A protein has these predicted regions:
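Extracytoplasmic low-complexity/disordered linkers and repeat tracts associated with LysM-containing
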Residues: 1-147, 151, 163, 167-177, ...
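Active-site region of chymotrypsin-like
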Residues: 154-162
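Short, solvent-exposed cationic patches
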Residues: 157, 201-202
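A short hydrophobic beta-strand segment most commonly corresponding to one strand
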Residues: 192-199
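Short, solvent-exposed mixed-charge patches
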Residues: 209-211
Length: 211
C-alpha cells in the first residue's frame, strides 16, 4: 500500500525491481503519480499486470533540509572534485564524494553499494548526468536520500545526506553538487552510494574510475 512520501522509484528500489516493470504491472504512465492508500502489484507475469501486493514498512517522510543557493555556490567554490565531470558523449561515471572507502559492494552481506566516509557537510556530487527522481526520507535505512535516473537502464542513489541542494525533477550534470554529506539514518558521517542497472544492484566500483 502506498504511503505518504512513497514514489514509484523508491518502492521499486526497496524490493529490487525495475521501476518500468512495476509501472507496467500497474498500468502507470509517466510521471508515475501515486495516491496514498493505493495498492500496487509487485510481481507476476510480465505479459499482464498481475501479481501480489506487498505490505512494506516505510518510515513517514520528514521535512527535507534544502541548502540555500548562496550556500550551494559557496560549497561548490570551496571544494574541488577529484574527477572531472563526464561529457555527454562519454557518459562516464565519477566519484560522488571525497573520502575513505569504508564499505564495499557485498549483496550477500546486505550491502548493495559502497560507503565513503567524509566530513559533515562536505559536497556530494552527481556521479553522472541525469534527472532527480526522488529526494526525501521515505525509504527506511537510507536517511535523507537522492535517486537520480541517468537513462532507461541506470539509476543511482546517494544516502545519509545532511541536506540537499536540488529538487525532484531537476536535471543534473556529472559533478554537480546535489547534497551535503551527513549521517541521517547512519551512526557516522558517510555517503552510501548505489547503482542499479535494470532495477538490480551492481558494484559501483565496476563503473567508477580507479583511484
Amino acid at each position: 500500500m502506498v504511503r505518504a512520501g512513497d514514489s514509484l522509484y523508491t518502492i521499486a528500489w526497496e524490493v529490487g525491481l525495475d521501476y518500468r516493470d512495476v509501472a507496467f504491472w500497474n498500468s502507470l504512465e509517466p510521471p508515475y503519480r501515486l495516491e496514498v492508500g493505493q495498492e500496487l502489484f509487485l510481481g507476476g507475469d510480465l505479459s499482464r499486470p498481475q501479481g501480489q501486493s506487498v505490505t512494506r514498512a516505510i518510515v513517514e517522510p520528514e521535512s527535507v533540509p534544502l541548502v540555500t543557493e548562496d550556500t550551494a555556490v559557496q560549497t561548490q567554490t570551496t571544494e574541488t572534485s577529484t574527477s572531472t565531470a563526464p561529457t555527454q558523449a562519454t557518459g562516464a561515471w565519477i566519484w560522488p564524494a571525497k573520502g575513505e572507502l569504508i564499505s564495499r559492494f557485498d549483496p550477500d552481506g546486505g550491502s548493495n553499494g559502497i560507503d565513503i566516509a567524509g566530513s559533515d557537510g562536505s559536497p556530494v556530487r552527481a556521479a553522472a548526468k541525469g534527472k532527480v527522481v526522488y529526494a526525501g526520507t521515505g525509504l527506511r535505512g537510507y536517511g535523507l536520500l537522492i535517486i537520480i535516473k541517468h537513462d532507461e537502464t541506470f539509476l543511482s542513489a546517494y544516502a545519509h545526506n545532511r541536506a540537499v541542494t536540488i529538487n525532484e525533477g531537476d536535471p543534473v550534470h556529472g559533478g554537480q553538487v546535489i547534497a551535503e554529506m551527513g549521517q541521517s539514518g547512519a551512526d557516522t558521517v558517510r555517503l552510501h552510494f548505489e547503482i542499479r542497472r535494470d532495477g538490480q544492484p551492481v558494484d559501483p566500483l565496476s563503473y567508477l574510475p580507479r583511484l
